[in-house]
Amino acid sequence: MDALQLVSNRSETDVPALMHALGQQARASAHALSLASTEAKNLALRVAAEQLRKRTQDLLLANARDLEGAKAQDANAAFLDRLTLDDKRIEAIARGLDEIAALPDPVGRMLARYERPNGLVIERVATPLGVIGIIYESRPAVTADAGALCLKAGNAAILRGGSESFFSATIIHACLTEGLRAAGLPEAAVSLVPTRDRAAVGEMLKGLDGTIDVIVPRGGKSLVARVQAEARVPVFAHLEGVNHIFVHRAADLEKAAIIIRNAKLRRPGVCGAAEILLVDEACMATHLAPLTRMLLDAGCAIRGDAATQTIDPRVTAAMESDWRTEYSDAIIAVRVIDGLNKAIAHIETHGSHHTDCIITEDQEAADRFLAEVDSAIVMHNASTQFADGGEFGFGAEIGIATGRLHARGPVGLEQLTSFKYRVHGNGQIRP
């Protein structure tokens, strides 16, 4: 274990050797964890939650250290919000661990069972994926959510958090380790990469000599693009949230205002925040001005098209890039668009297939939007900030997968399993 003691980004660290050791220990732990009882896994999670509550002050001090470093790098307000922990957020992290412990164990779940004419009984049963590498940026809570979900689904996890949240993640990981120890499970089942050296990411993307089965990136566009370009193992891609709200001609104005304000401004830095507002030309005369002024008065900057710029001098002109930008801040792009067909086409062209919403009282229009918009999550009359595993009843999530293979939408327990076939015979041979 000496090679895995906490280190920083010192040049003398042998990163390939360090990561190779992590991979080997994770692979050995994965087998033991795949056979672990539900009771042991739940105990580990409950003890980890208890440790988080006990070590709140330690975590706040570590987080203050992270915030100091981020401010020194001139991080913006949305970034600092994602990084910040307080008593309430720490309790939410601990409660999330308890909630994952309370969820049904997905491992061993019978997915299908049938009998063939020759008497063979075939069962499809959920199994762990193996070793999951998770690469993420500034959110300290991801350390707990990702580690806990992988653990409950019987997977070993190698967590590589952002350098900005290094000290916070270290305390959270220590709490998870205490839980594993208390439950008699391998401590290396959830590993935190103990260096901020960026070379560690490159080693993970190579697969650590075949020890990593899947990579899950959670972060900005540049991180996900690098992972997709360089990874030699399968990837659950979590692309940026260029999320749209389309205000249809049959939208209730009061309902639209409430939804849009929440979707943009509740927490502008989360991946489910709305970034683009499309207003149907047919309701522009009644809806555009009040919605625009509501956002401006609430402190949201607007990048608008020509029609939106005439509403208020505080609106600045949108550039072409604004229609495909994840601001992660109190900024939104607003455009008037000619009906449902054009709105769907705009989302297909400029969106990231993450989360998109229509606001309308016309059920036929809503049904078309839900059927034709090819995003992981499509919504009708609800805030895009519900794009969250916890809100979906998954307990938590590792991210929102925007690809089309295996996992799509919130990646929770079920998405962190695969399956195998069990075949029961009574001496049958194939003719």
From Swiss-Prot:
What is the residue range of the signal peptide feature?
A: none
What GO molecular function annotations does the UniProt record carry, in alphabetical order? glutamate-5-semialdehyde dehydrogenase activity; NADP binding
Gene Ontology biological process: L-proline biosynthetic process
Ranges annotated as spanning the membrane: none
InterPro entries registered for this protein in UniProt = Ald_DH/histidinol_DH, Ald_DH_C, Ald_DH_N, Aldehyde_DH_dom, Glu-5-SA_DH, GPR_dom
SUPFAM superfamilies per record: ALDH-like
Q: What is its EC number?
A: 1.2.1.41
Q: What does this protein do?
A: Catalyzes the NADPH-dependent reduction of L-glutamate 5-phosphate into L-glutamate 5-semialdehyde and phosphate. The product spontaneously undergoes cyclization to form 1-pyrroline-5-carboxylate.
* HAMAP family noted in UniProt: ProA
Q: What is this protein called?
A: Gamma-glutamyl phosphate reductase
Lineage summary = Bacteria, Pseudomonadati, Pseudomonadota, Alphaproteobacteria, Hyphomicrobiales
